[in-house]
Amino acid sequence: MSASDPLLTQDQLALVEGLDALCSRHIDDKLLFDLDQQARYPFDVMQALSDGGWASMAVPESHGGAGASARDMAVVLEELSRHSLVVGQAYFSMWILGAEAVIRLGTNSQANEWLPRIATEGARVAFALTEPGSGSDAAALTTRAEKRGSDYVVTGQKVFTTGAAVADVIITAVRTSRGGTKHAGISTLMIDPQLQGVDIRKIPKMGLKGIDLCEVFFDDVVVPETCLLGELDAGWAGVLPGLAIERLYLAAISVGAMRDVLDLCLEHASTRETFGKALGSHQMIAEKLVEMRVAIETSRALVKQAAEMVDRGDGEAVNLASIAKLHATRSYVSATREAVQIFGGYGFTDEYPVSRHYRDCKYLEIGGGASEIQKIVIARSMGLRP
């Protein structure tokens, strides 16, 4: 195991050791191959994590959880993703994002219902924001929710909703009023995917096949007003804090996945011989491995900095999370490209996991705000944009 974190606290080290033991029992190369080839959600691994109490990490102690800090959650996601990017992404998308939204926006009744369900049952919560006509301009959403009596009637379409096909509830950003800027009049609803008028369709994709990206169609879906999450017309301000958390944790996931790539390359470079010596002893190959190690260390440092600021509640956390995501995700993409080069023709075959990393990595550079969006956020923080 290369590039482990030398600055872990004793509590964090215990988290890493516990996850390593669980993942070593439940995740192997065959499972990862099957999840990819069959486009199958890792139900068994996620159930094992839930049974072991790991779903409770992002839930406050007051609601049956562990109340983990952002620093600890970043450590958990790095370790999970070192074993399996799909499992790390599922853990983040289905448990952390949902818990964060309910903690921040939910009523007492909603918190009392959903937070214990996440903590003890591993309830799966999807988050639907992006629409076909908005893309990176996520605030330009058109899915609308009209108030009729004591209900909302929802009409519209979402796209690239992670895990919607397996979710117990879908937190959905909707437009509840017009007027003012596009950032105003936005609310969030907790929508039961089993309601009449909800249609979920999986989107075929090139990578990260073990967790679905979905289109979600809402055709006059009647949603009780008690499912309003947060204040009515809270606007983009109700959505934005969740995006900062998403960017931080996607960076942590990228660090873990990069560590797996480096481990695979180190093993291959030390066992394969070319021109009468180990592959890794060739200067050009060694240089690639060194660059991977440097990328891991710098990315992790940025993650730690951003996580510290999140825990402090510092307003600069949003910008630092964007910096961490920009650097870590593009470093992961670069590492996988070099990994395929190191493996040569073998890296181009499905038999070797670096090819899976090559297909998976691009999602992290796009999801949670593309790299170009992160640059805009960072430029704005530097006073370069209005």
Place the predicted regions along the sequence by residue.
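Alpha-helical interface subdomain recognition
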Residues: M1-H83, V87, S93-M94, L105-Q110, ...
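Cytochrome P450 C-terminal beta-domain/meander region
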Residues: D137-T155, T349-P353
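A short, charged helix-loop
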Residues: C214-P241
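A short, Trp-centered hydrophobic/proline-enriched beta-strand micro-motif
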Residues: E121-L129
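Short glycine/proline-enriched turns and hinge-like loops at secondary-structure junctions
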Residues: A68-S69, D137-A139, G163-D168, K182-G185, ...
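Short Ser/Thr-interspersed hydrophobic loop/turn segments at strand-loop and sheet-helix junctions
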Residues: G53, V76-S81, V174, I191-L195, ...
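Flexible, small-/acidic-enriched active-site or ligand-binding loops
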Residues: A140-T142, Q194-P224
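A short core secondary-structure module
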Residues: D151, T155-R201
